[in-house]
Amino acid sequence: MRTMAHASVVALLLTLSGCCRPEVMATQPVTLRPQETGMWCWAASGEMAMDFLGTNVTQCDQANQRFGRTDCCNNPVPGACVNGGWPEFNKYGFNSEHTSDAPLTWAQVQSEIFCARRPFAFSWHWDGGGGHMMIVRGYVTLEGVNYVYVNDPWAPNVGDQRIVTYDAYVSGAGYTHWDDYFRIARQ
């Protein structure tokens, strides 16, 4: 009986040791890719995520695929190519999941960044219409406040890296949370 109890404790410890225990801070080295037009935040976010995972897909190629065109890589970019959209990871050999009008929980943020060691894309919906997509590449908790590290492809050809509170990631003045693309991985 004692041997069986000992074996059960060992099995439990082995199981628990395989669980991910996120640290207070974690980041992933995601290269900032500014959006190349005023509307390609979605393509820049797709480019950042896929580039991090080892596949370089340009923003104009994503626009060509999204809009059924072949001229979005031209200079200047034709106006018909300059539209909003969503990343289409499946067209480039990736699987992903996405939320609808909901952010990832803090535990999910930690799991994606620390445990799975990958970034994820998120978007805000502006109160007046339209929206904006960015990448979360890290997180930290300081003095009881949760923050996320963001690669923001705005402004065109510039971009920005910043840290925002988790609460601001969820919603804020002038915007609500839209869709997140997470668990992005090769098929």
Name what the model sees in each region.
Residues 4, 31-32, 43, 119, ...:
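Proline-rich low-complexity regions
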Residues 7, 23, 30, 77-79:
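Generic low-complexity segments that are intrinsically disordered, proline-rich and/or Lys/Arg-biased
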Residues 10-11, 58, 165:
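N-terminal non-cleavable signal-anchor helices
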Residues 17-18:
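C-terminal motif of bacterial Sec signal peptides marking the signal peptidase cleavage site
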Residues 23-70:
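Active-site nucleophile-adjacent alpha helix/oxyanion-hole segment immediately C-terminal to the catalytic cysteine
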